[in-house]
Amino acid sequence: MVKIAFNTPTAVQKEEARQDVEALVSRTVRAQILTGKELRVVPQEKDGSSGRCMLTLLGLSFILAGLIVGGACIYKYFMPKSTIYHGEMCFFDSEDPVNSIPGGEPYFLPVTEEADIREDDNIAIIDVPVPSFSDSDPAAIIHDFEKGMTAYLDLLLGNCYLMPLNTSIVMTPKNLVELFGKLASGKYLPHTYVVREDLVAVEEIRDVSNLGIFIYQLCNNRKSFRLRRRDLLLGFNKRAIDKCWKIRHFPNEFIVETKICQE
């Protein structure tokens, strides 16, 4: 008879098997714990990143708002201030044929202006509209006391004409403000006389960038010419002049008729 015998595990084998099971369970538990921690940490990092983005955007919004408000304050308090004035004067033209009739009543011609006077910049910008009852041209005029220059822009021709500022004729911006104030209040009788100046365009000016920002803005990209008084030109040939026009304005308590001639 053959006997089949089963070997029963010894105590040592049982102990080794138990240790293997415990080690496997321990590794599994640690893996689950680590996985849970990682899962908990990742949302925290995402939440922290979103919070930082929100704080950054909020800070940028405050900075942008501060720049806008600050810029508005700077523009309001530090930009040059100007006031637009309107006025009208009437003058007696002794050369008008109507006024040469014996026994006739004097006929006064009106001159209207709009002036942008900037005392801080020491400048006066005059707008002479199309006249209603005279043969003069509409024009934009700049009297720049800082640069000592006067610029005429003939709005019909589109050309600029420049000359040294004549302070014996042109009032300072402060005095011009007072003059327009009198005209507006009716304290000044706007019936006055006319002073004539005869000017000739002698040469073209290619670059007006050194004549100040205001004259540059008026005359840039336009044909510009230097003016001289006719009586100061030696050997001047009157027959060489074939085009003349007039601009009437009042830079003072009287009317100035600026006659400009050009070949």
Curated annotation (Swiss-Prot):
Membrane topology: Single-pass type II membrane protein
GO BP terms in the entry: plasma cell differentiation
Organism of provenance: Mus musculus
Main location: membrane
Family: Belongs to the ITM2 family.
Gene designation: Itm2a
Listed name of the protein: Integral membrane protein 2A
Pfam families to which the protein is assigned, alphabetical: BRICHOS
Disulphides: C160-C219
Keyword annotations of the record: Disulfide bond, Glycoprotein, Membrane, Signal-anchor, Transmembrane, Transmembrane helix
PROSITE patterns reported in the protein's UniProt record: BRICHOS
Tagged with keyword Disulfide bond: yes
Residues the record marks as carrying a glycan: N166
One GO cellular component, as annotated: membrane
Domain BRICHOS span(s) in chain numbering: 133-227
Tissue specificity statement from the Swiss-Prot or TrEMBL entry: Expressed in mandibular condyles, in bone and in hair follicles. Strong expression in osteogenic tissues, such as neonatal calvaria, paws, tail and skin.
Transmembrane segments: 54-74
Entry's localization field: Membrane
